[in-house]
């Protein structure tokens, strides 16, 4: 009795590989502002110099307020080397269309906010006054 070996199809040996495509930018460049946190004992900063470097290398513009990273032991030189623009005027930072903060917006910041501005930060509704929320809604803050 002759026994024959089963044949194994070679199609099981191939794996599908992902193809990496060159993604072209859509032309929309973001201008992101990082203000210095003023809350009591707030030492965090929203973006590290490494994160700023990634944003800048992807064609975006990042502005950071002077000494914003000192509580997290990042110097202005660290951010400048990563490609950020150091801004010495708090009012100028708040003119950026996108703000990134590690602490919530406080009442003192509301007059500085611009129309249709995007703010990426925590928000504590229980700590906000209804008038503050109304001002943010009037300015169409997202």
Where are each of the predicted segments found?
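Structural/interface elements that position substrates and couple domains in central-metabolism enzymes
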Residues: 2-134, 138
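Glycine-rich loop-to-alpha-helix module at the N-terminal edge of alpha/beta enzyme cores
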Residues: 142
């Amino acid at each position: 009795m002759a026994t024959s070996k089963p044949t194994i199809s070679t199609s099981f040996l191939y794996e599908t590989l992902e193809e990496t495509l060159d993604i072209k930018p859509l032309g929309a460049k973001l201008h992101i502002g990082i203000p210095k946190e003023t809350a009591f004992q707030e030492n965090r900063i929203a973006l590290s110099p490494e994160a700023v470097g990634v944003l800048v290398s992807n064609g975006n513009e990042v502005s950071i307020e002077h000494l914003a990273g000192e509580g997290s032991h990042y110097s202005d030189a660290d951010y400048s080397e990563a490609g950020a623009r150091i801004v010495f005027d708090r009012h100028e930072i708040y003119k950026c269309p996108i703000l990134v903060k590690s602490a919530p917006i406080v009442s003192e910041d509301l007059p500085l906010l611009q129309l249709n501005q995007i703010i990426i930060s925590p928000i504590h509704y229980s700590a906000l006054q209804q008038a503050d929320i109304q001002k943010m809604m009037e300015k169409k803050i997202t």
